[in-house]
């Protein structure tokens, strides 16, 4: 019998393949994106030391929007994570889309982070 794998299981396999080749360093940390049905999260991670340097999400107290699951909210999270990263002196990052397609909310977050000063 043919079984169909869930979308999230397929995404996790894609993410594992990408993570095998991609890691963040202290000089160029990894900007990781996680997308749920209601919210979006972004973290800047130093994989060598295993430390999250900066994070932002639609659940933050600094974030005030009615809806956390649209592209406008994702763009605000991108601006917020870029602002927090620049305060810590981080300008160059490696973008990790987390196995998601580079489209919609993930693309909006990435574009807003680029416009706010992050380079990737």
UniProtKB/Swiss-Prot annotation:
Keywords: Ribonucleoprotein, Ribosomal protein, RNA-binding, rRNA-binding. InterPro entries: Ribosomal_uL18_bac-type (IPR004389), Ribosomal_uL18_bac/euk (IPR005484). Gene3D superfamilies: 3.30.420.100. One of its GO terms (molecular function) is 5S rRNA binding. GO terms for biological process: translation. GO terms for cellular component: cytosolic large ribosomal subunit. SUPFAM superfamilies: Translational machinery components (SSF53137). This is one of the proteins that bind and probably mediate the attachment of the 5S RNA into the large ribosomal subunit, where it forms part of the central protuberance. Belongs to the universal ribosomal protein uL18 family. NCBIfam families: L18_bact. Part of the 50S ribosomal subunit; part of the 5S rRNA/L5/L18/L25 subcomplex. Contacts the 5S and 23S rRNAs. This is Large ribosomal subunit protein uL18. It comes from Bacillus licheniformis (strain ATCC 14580 / DSM 13 / JCM 2505 / CCUG 7422 / NBRC 12200 / NCIMB 9375 / NCTC 10341 / NRRL NRS-1264 / Gibson 46).
């Amino acid at each position: 019998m043919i079984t169909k794998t869930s979308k999230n299981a397929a995404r996790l396999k894609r993410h594992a393949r990408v993570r095998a080749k991609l890691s963040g360093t202290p000089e160029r940390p990894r900007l990781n994106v996680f997308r749920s049905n209601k919210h979006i999260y972004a973290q800047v991670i130093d994989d060598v030391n295993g430390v999250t340097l900066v994070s932002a999400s639609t659940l933050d107290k600094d974030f005030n929007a009615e809806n956390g699951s649209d592209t406008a909210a994702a763009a605000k999270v991108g601006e917020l994570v870029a602002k927090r990263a620049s305060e810590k002196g981080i300008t160059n990052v490696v973008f990790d889309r987390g196995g998601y397609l580079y489209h919609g909310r993930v693309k909006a977050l990435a574009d807003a982070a680029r416009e706010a000063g992050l380079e990737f």
